[in-house]
């Protein structure tokens, strides 16, 4: 099963609420040995997007990349491998795979049964979705508290653009509220929530070329290495 790259210490897990290769530990070592600056640019891109200052983000990212050496890269890769394995164990009814997120960064995607998540036109989590999220929070987020979380909501093409944009944001907010409320995930761990509505680039289609509306109604959760994790890796204390 293909593993994902650690880009400037960045790694992602995408949960959709609707091959074989090197481990992150090995890739982290290779990254630390030769790709620090490029990896730093990946961190910088995330920082720039979050702050609205691309120039500052690039500068910060470059510095972070230089700072992440062979040992630190391996430690971050190993930690993200553990988080990935924990997600796979917690979500045995889901598919865990490597993919690229919307920014082109390699990520681990955990795909749940879309039918248990949201009903059409609704942003309320269904009972099965709550059970899956609670297990994910307990066995992954609450244990790997040094990862940052980004939540993205999506809608099917049913309804108006404006309605679906609001609906997708509501779905992302519903997931955040459940994770930070019932599941007691630290609110500061969730760095962003965003709705994309029925953006054509993100709709899901079946083999017949028609939209799979149930699959389009989803939330994606990305996990990536926090500055805390990077600092601990550089200090050699990351467990």
Predicted regions and their residues:
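Bacterial N-terminal signal peptides that target proteins for export
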Residues: 1-8
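C-terminal motif of bacterial Sec signal peptides marking the signal peptidase cleavage site
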Residues: 15-19
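Generic structural signal for residues in well-ordered beta-strands
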Residues: 96, 149, 190-193
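Short, low-complexity, glycine-enriched hydrophobic/amphipathic alpha-helices that associate
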Residues: 21-88
